[in-house]
């Protein structure tokens, strides 16, 4: 408002004479400075309007209870190209170019008159001692000045005002400051050890320093306990529409107890006994047993069995005799019949299915024996090539012992083949079938 009133007052008081003079002579430096002042004043007024607008917004927001999000730009809002700054005093003269008055002094120095000086010495006696003073042998400092000193800085001590040729102070970190003369400096020919430190001379024990730990150990610190209600109504300048979740996840401090998340549990598969094959979701019935051989031949040809196994075999033979007349022979049925309800029956059934015709890559015992012989020969050759040396023999024995302990050497079992042999040995023997059926089995395994 003050600016507008001043503009109106200026327009009312304007004279035509001044305008005519301005038109005739052109813009003066004073008028150019006035324009820049007006422009700066308008900029200040615009900034004031922005400030008042922001203040009004703040006053409007001050009493509300709603949460407000404020987004701020990363850069200050400014024009892409800044205006060049122009000085207000464009028409003013440079003060360095101004001429200043110079005054000449006509008086001169009077020449020195030696005669008048000699006459004054006659009237005013001056006593000057011309006798040389005796030199002090214990003079402090480094002695006389050398002839090659050309400046005061080379004469004085660095960054001080001390003249080393007059007084030289030697600083000893243990004994303190000692003033030495040039005679003492010349007399010091042999070096002496410094005094022992106080920790040795006075038998003082130094405290053991605890090593500092520079590793970062996060700490939650002391959290103040504030007992306030969950809902605080009618608080001034506090937003009441904020919603947050109490589950904020794990804390940032890894050393806090109880922050390790629990791992999910996995269901492990339980080893179940082998079952018979399923065809279309229905259990296949066991194949009908083949006609057994006559009982006297079985008893005559079979080896003597233990008493625990002889009774069930005899009972099975009698049952087979009763059912042999009614059940005809079926092609493809197994030649050996075992009680399907037992665990050995399921094991043998799985072995037959896994190692049937063309499924299992079985090796004969001859090939295994040949491989073992080759391995033994190679070990003997290595032993003979490295033999004759005590350390090599010890090394070979140690290797053989390690192989025996780990199960890879000759002293260990035969691996999975040996385990299978032990399982097959534990199965009770089955009476041998008829001769033609045994030949067919051998043909099937060989093919």
Curated annotation (Swiss-Prot):
One of its GO terms (molecular function) is actin binding. Residues 406-418 have a biased composition (Gly residues). InterPro entries: WASH1 (IPR028290), WASH1_WAHD (IPR021854). Residues 343-365 form the WH2 domain. GO terms for cellular component: cytosol; early endosome; early endosome membrane; recycling endosome; recycling endosome membrane; WASH complex. Residues 284-296 have a biased composition (Pro residues). Residues 1-42, 279-389, 403-447 are annotated as: Disordered. Residues 364-380 have a biased composition (Basic and acidic residues). Residues 331-447 are annotated as: VCA. The modification Phosphoserine is found at residue 327. The keyword Phosphoprotein applies. GO terms for biological process: Arp2/3 complex-mediated actin nucleation; endocytic recycling; endosomal transport; exocytosis; regulation of Arp2/3 complex-mediated actin nucleation; retrograde transport, endosome to Golgi. It is found in: Early endosome membrane; Recycling endosome membrane. Residues 1-149 are annotated as: WHD1. Residues 438-447 have a biased composition (Acidic residues). Pfam families: WASH_WAHD. Keywords: Actin-binding, Endosome, Membrane, Phosphoprotein, Transport. It comes from the Eukaryota. Belongs to the WASH1 family. May act as a nucleation-promoting factor at the surface of endosomes, where it recruits and activates the Arp2/3 complex to induce actin polymerization, playing a key role in the fission of tubules that serve as transport intermediates during endosome sorting. Interacts (via WHD1 region) with WASHC2C; the interaction is direct. WASH genes duplicated to multiple chromosomal ends during primate evolution, with highest copy number reached in humans, whose WASH repertoires probably vary extensively among individuals. It is therefore difficult to determine which gene is functional or not. The gene coding for this protein is located in the pseudoautosomal region 2 (PAR2) of X and Y chromosomes. This is WAS protein family homolog 6. It comes from Homo sapiens (Human).
